[in-house]
Amino acid sequence: MSKNKTKKGGDSTIALNKKARHDYFIEDKYEAGLALQGWEVKSLRAGKAHIGDSYVLLQNGEAFLFGATITPLNVASTHVVCDPTRIRKLLLKKSELERLIGLVERQSYTLIPLSMYWSRAWVKVEIGLAKGKKEHDKREDLKEREWQRDKERMMKNKGR
């Protein structure tokens, strides 16, 4: 008799960076692991993370996540110092790191975190290789979104 494995329902997303898609053209996406401490994992399980103002910086051939806030739980241990905005190392393959370093340094791309999510028992960060948008590009996107919304509304009302 085989055992049925129960899968936990729900969303595996911990945090989204909605501002990133508004402020940048996303050219390519990468998945990176995140080096965390124990209290950070517990806080992430509780969903206490914010990556809205964070960015990725490449130093000495390694990638680091700056500005991400993981709020510690109230029941955290007293002998561990919890720094909510500490710099966290991103875990990428060497070939991916070399490619990203080349693009960021030579072609003026920016690396920004798009989302933080669970992949099995591991926390992953989706990194976007991006270029900044100008103000007129943002307005064009807004007009396009409004047009799509109006078009949907017209099609919905037409069927009535």
From Swiss-Prot:
Q: Which domain of life is it from?
A: Bacteria
Q: Kindly give the InterPro entries that the UniProt entry links to this protein.
A: SmpB (IPR023620), SsrA-bd_prot (IPR000037), SsrA-bd_prot_CS (IPR020081)
Please provide the record's keywords in A-Z order: Cytoplasm, RNA-binding
Q: Which Pfam families does the entry mention?
A: SmpB
Gene3D superfamilies this protein is in? Answer: 2.40.280.10
For this protein, the record's CDD domains field holds: SmpB (cd09294)
- An example of a Gene Ontology BP annotation on this entry? trans-translation
Q: Which GO terms describe its cellular component?
A: cytosol
Location of region: Disordered: 133-160
Which terms does the record give in the GO molecular function aspect? RNA binding
Write out the transmembrane intervals.
Answer: none
Cellular localization per UniProt: Cytoplasm
Membership in a protein family:
Belongs to the SmpB family.
Q: HAMAP family, from UniProt?
A: SmpB
Its function? Required for rescue of stalled ribosomes mediated by trans-translation. Binds to transfer-messenger RNA (tmRNA), required for stable association of tmRNA with ribosomes. tmRNA and SmpB together mimic tRNA shape, replacing the anticodon stem-loop with SmpB. tmRNA is encoded by the ssrA gene; the 2 termini fold to resemble tRNA(Ala) and it encodes a 'tag peptide', a short internal open reading frame. During trans-translation Ala-aminoacylated tmRNA acts like a tRNA, entering the A-site of stalled ribosomes, displacing the stalled mRNA.
Record protein name field: SsrA-binding protein
Organism lineage reads as:
Bacteria, Pseudomonadati, Pseudomonadota, Gammaproteobacteria, Aeromonadales
Q: Which gene encodes it?
A: smpB
